[in-house]
Curated annotation (Swiss-Prot):
Species this chain originates from: Rattus norvegicus (Rat)
Top-level taxon of the source organism: Eukaryota
The gene coding this protein: Znf365
UniProt-recorded Gene Ontology molecular function terms: zinc ion binding
Tissue: Expressed in cerebral cortex, hippocampus, olfactory tubercle and striatum.
Protein name in the entry: Protein ZNF365
Amino acid sequence: MQQTTFEESRYRWQDSLENVAVCLPFRCPRCGDHTRFRSLSSLRAHLEFSHSYEERTLLTKCSLLPSLKDTDLLRSSELPKQGKLLRGHAKVTKQKPSYVNLYSISHGHSKDPKPFEMVAERPVSYVQTYTAVDIRADSLDAPRSSSGLPTQDTKAAFEAHVREKFNRMVEAVDRTIEKRIDKLTKELAQKTAELLEVRAAFVQLTQKKQEVQRRERALHKQVDVAVEMIAVLKQRLTESEEELLRKEEEVVTFNHFLEAAAEKEVQGKARLQDFIENLLQRVELAEKQLEYYQSQQASGFSHDTSEHMLTDISSSRKSRCLSRGHQHSVCNHPELKAHFHLKGRSYLKKAKDERAGMQPAKAIHEQAESPREFFRPAKKGEHLGLSRKGNFRPKMAKKKPTAIVNII
């Protein structure tokens, strides 16, 4: 696109130079189109300086003496014929183009081929004026020749007058043309300056356009890189979100597992605590029963009193166990209840069988004294027995952890 605009600007410069060449209206007939002049005086000086004398004489003849050959015919003609000739010359000049070949008008019937090369271009107005002046001069010379005046002097004077008048006309036309050419030259210089300004502005705009295009390409590259990075970041964000969701699901699952494990642990601890409490109660009950049996064997209580006391103690312990029990207590399990009750009953049967072999009198005496001795305060003689019982209780307490471990 820039190359085409540069070529168009170059063609415009060439057209302007061609227009400058066209503004020179007069060309040399011998040199051609490449030699042009602004005025007729410059063309004449060129012809006198550059070309031969024969060519100059032909040019003067063709430009100044075309009407002298027809003076004899015009003398015998009348004024209406002169008007007809004027109209005829006007028609001829109208049929011709803007520049007329004077040599072809004056020497139309010449046999020499060389003079046809000499062609002087003149405007149509010059030809009309020159022909009218020749006709008037011929009409004036006719009565003078008839009166007997010398025709050669009149012709020379007329030629000098016509040449002087023609030179004045040519100078006036040259001045007018020069003024017009100067005006056109100024306008051309102004247009050329404007064109140079426009061309400089065009070059500046072209450079700005190239800079803008370069920046546009750089910005396009940056935008492409940014779009690619955004796509990569979006993909990474999606992957991280998926990973986060998966981790959250794992955390939720692990939390559920921990909650279930904690709940099971709490339940297990509660059950274990209930079981240990129940076991301790049963151990305590067994110790008390053992102490009671030992005291019964030592004191010789009767069988009925022992059964009554055992039932009272067992009922009281059972009520305490039920009051202190938990929802998940081991006492509520039927298998453990049956196990402990069967074991206790077998132990009680053995104690009953041992007591059955004792004497009836001693049993009756012990029955009478058993309530009093059981509920009376301790004496000095019985202090050792009580201390022995107190010492026996910590030993059983020391044995509790081993039993609990074995049970667990």
